[in-house]
Amino acid sequence: MHLWCTDCNRSFQSESNLRQHLNSKVHRPADVRCPGRGCNKSFVSHAALVLHFESGTCPSRMTREQLNRLVVRADTNNYITNPNRLLTGPMGRYEPPTPTVMWATDRSWNGSAYQCFLCNKTFNKLVHLNQHLQSPSHEDKIYRCPKLDCRIEFGTLSGLCQHVEGGFCGVRMFRQVRDVMDGLTRGFNALTV
């Protein structure tokens, strides 16, 4: 089976690769504006905007940890957050766990590569291992697909947004999910970050 983008005259090996290409800035306008103070960037999807916040590159200085806290507080019915992965705070309110900051040293060298002490993944450079340790790779998966027969868990909101926007399990078809995603957008726009 050949998957083909006729506009670009390119073939793709899988449906997901073609779908990702069709949803990229090559074919879609960057019309999702960042509401962050001092930021004038635009993105092709809400997932890309969320990733912008999570990466800490927005001039507003929004971090992944702050974003998680805002979403957990807004998702009072735990529609997209998993209460089993959250901590119970004052007055019974759920809070996302505070990420643990970890750094690897030269002692992570196993003779042929730098090895992550949590998952055994290897890296050619120590800086790459430390980037891995600072990423959400080992954080709790506090987000979940709201579709009952899917329930895939995600460590980042951007991962959940990509899952929903990509239509991987059909969850985007449900009005309630569209309402939640639109609510996230309104919430971002209401932020004074």
Model regions: which residues?
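Alpha-helical interaction/linker modules in multidomain eukaryotic proteins
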Residues: 1-193
